Structure formats: structure tokens, C-alpha cells
């Protein structure tokens, strides 16, 4: 909900479908058919929004949309972005109150593996000044 509030404050309209799963947990457990079924459901549910960005919070799930879906043959969601990737590219009307303090950043392993940390650093820089 907090991420939705930030996106709305930036001037973006947000649609958050419920009950969708990327299938990543099934894929990790070797249940490819179940993963493919969940992925197809997600692609079908998001089809009316083709061309719009799909913004996600969880790196493992989000990278499944970008990388695993095409490999499973269920479609492609190439416009899928992590929340911080989207904000780094589309800050919209957001005005950050500058904070002057030290922060320790520990990135998600998938963010590191897929070189997604620069977006986190950029958004933190918008806040930290």
C-alpha cells in the first residue's frame, strides 16, 4: 500500500490486481507446469494493460516476469520494472524532503545478480541529497 501511495503521489494511476502469482516458488521447486500455469494467468490478467509498465516490489518475482516468462513460452512482460527502477526513470511530481544521515544499503541477491542496484542508489540519492 505504501508503494501505491508513493506512485499516486507522483501522479501515476495504479491498478493492483489481486490473486496473481508469478509462479517463482513453483519454478524454484522444479514444478515447471504449475509455474507455467500461474505465469499464464498473470499474462492474461495483465493483457488489457499491454504497453503500460508493470511495477513490482519483490525482485525474484519481478525478474521472473522479465526473464522466466519468455523462457517458459507464456509471453513477455518486458515493461516490468522494480519499484525503484520505475521511480528512478519516472519520478513524476515527487518532491523529496532531503535527509542528511548515513544509510547502509543491503540489496536483494536478485537485484545484485541482475545489476539492478543502480536504481536503488539513484532513488536513495534523491532522498538523501
Give the residues covered by each predicted segment.
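Iron-sulfur cluster-binding electron-transfer modules in prokaryotic oxidoreductases
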Residues: 1-129
